[in-house]
Regions:
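Nucleotidyltransferase catalytic core that binds NTPs
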Residues: 1-194, 282
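Short amphipathic alpha-helical face segments that pack within enzyme cores
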Residues: 16, 20-21, 213-216, 276
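Charged phosphate-binding loop/patch that engages nucleotide di/tri-phosphates or the phosphate backbone
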Residues: 172-196, 353-384
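Divalent metal-dependent catalytic cores for phosphoryl transfer on phosphate-bearing substrates
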Residues: 199-202, 219, 223-345
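A short, charge-rich alpha-helical start-of-domain segment used by transcription regulators
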Residues: 205-209
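Internal alpha/beta core interface subdomains
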Residues: 345, 352-353
Length: 384
């Protein structure tokens, strides 16, 4: 007889705690397949993300034995749970079905009689949760008609609320969230402030489109090279927050706030918008993280000892898909998939060649970044 598990929850977002419960249940109770059923909004809880977006995140975790069950039945009453269980029963005929839930979910079910009337339901697999007395909740459930409860305990399982709190602090928490899920979160800016709406009044439409494209490209690079994805996402979204200001307005802020006395920077909008942008990111958008602020400051010309976040944003700014084609662009894109430093060096050198070819003056700050990258790459090659 086929053995099927069904885990219901809001999955806002799905995390490794959910998957640990699924894998434990699969192993201990020999489940062939486990369905994950994301609940729609209800009077009980209004999820941060829409049902559609949460389903997409769950889709990053599906496999041959872990599947997404899609429906819009809210878990409002026990009848709703019976209806959801019936969906599984219809799909799998005479299979044995095991609802999987946390102690918190078990405590909220007030009548179990109808659940056990379903011939497919064999037992409840219930996982202990911090803040809930397993003994008391199980006794309460038994008083409401529950029986055949398989009680399991895993090491500390985070809540989705704890995961969202870490995301708000720009922490990828790889010990809590699968990297492919965090990649999707960072790429779309889920659970982060709505920077797109904040930037809309201060950026042109084309600049905003470029910014969103830079975020996607930068986060893709961070994911590929195991760099901090959330920090990269935020830095990419804010990297051009001062770009549409007039040169004189940027100069005034730089002087009034003592951001720089460097004549080269003050005279160049291309250099100045990064410096002023970092100030605005801090003063207007509440950014305090040094990696993010540095990535905004130096995204145009770089600097010695760039972090991976800085490299991802600098590169994404020059290779994102909306960028007009220029000599060497495709080669830099290919390099970026393999090595951030090599790609950044190629990008800065390409810019230098172009500026010199039209008789322009090349920034010594960019040259410092080139020299530093060349030195580091030479050392790496010598060690190899």
């Amino acid at each position: 007889m086929e053995r099927i598990g069904l885990m219901l929850g809001y999955f806002d977002p799905i995390h490794l705690g959910h998957l640990a419960m699924v894998r434990d249940a699969q192993k201990v109770y020999r489940l062939d397949t486990v369905y994950l059923y994301p609940l729609p909004e209800s009077s009980e809880y209004t999820p941060v993300l829409s049902l559609k977006k949460r389903r997409k995140l769950i889709g990053k975790c599906v496999s041959d034995s872990i599947k997404l069950l899609s429906s819009t039945i809210p878990l409002v009453t026990e009848d709703s749970l019976i209806e959801i269980l019936s969906l599984v029963q219809e799909r799998h005929g005479d299979a044995a079905v095991f609802p999987i839930m946390g102690m918190d979910r078990l405590s909220r079910i007030t009548n179990f009689a109808g659940i056990y009337l379903l011939p497919a339901v064999k037992a409840l697999i219930v996982y202990s949760r911090v803040g809930y007395s397993s003994e008391k909740v199980v006794q309460l459930a038994q008083g409401r008609g529950a029986h055949s409860i398989f009680l399991r305990k895993l090491s500390t399982i985070p809540s989705s609320e704890q995961v969202r709190e870490q995301i708000s602090l720009f922490n990828d928490v790889p010990e809590w969230v699968p990297s492919r899920v965090m990649h999707a979160i960072a790429r779309k800016g889920y659970y982060l402030p709505n920077y797109k709406a904040m930037l809309k009044p201060v950026l042109s439409q084309s600049r905003l489109k470029h910014t969103i494209s830079v975020r996607k490209t930068a986060v893709d690079l961070a994911y590929r090279h195991d760099a901090p994805m959330l920090k990269t996402s935020v830095a990419a979204m804010l990297h051009d927050c001062a770009k549409c200001m007039t040169h004189s307005a940027m100069q005034k802020i730089a002087r009034d706030k003592f951001l720089t006395e460097d004549g080269e920077v003050l005279s160049s909008p291309a250099l100045l918008h990064g410096v002023v942008g970092a100030y605005i990111a801090k003063s207007s958008y509440g950014i305090r993280d040094k990696d993010i602020l540095n990535a905004i400051t130096y995204h145009t010309v770089g600097r010695p000892n760039m972090t991976d976040v800085e490299l991802c944003v600098l590169l994404a700014d020059s290779i994102e898909p909306l960028r007009p084609k220029y000599p060497g662009l495709e080669e830099i894109r290919i390099l970026a998939k393999c090595d951030l430093k090599s790609a950044a060096l190629a990008s800065l050198r390409t810019t230098k060649s172009y500026i010199l070819s039209i008789g322009g003056k090349y920034s010594m700050k960019a040259q410092d970044a080139i020299d530093d990258l060349l030195k580091k790459l030479t050392r790496i090659h010598q060690e190899v």
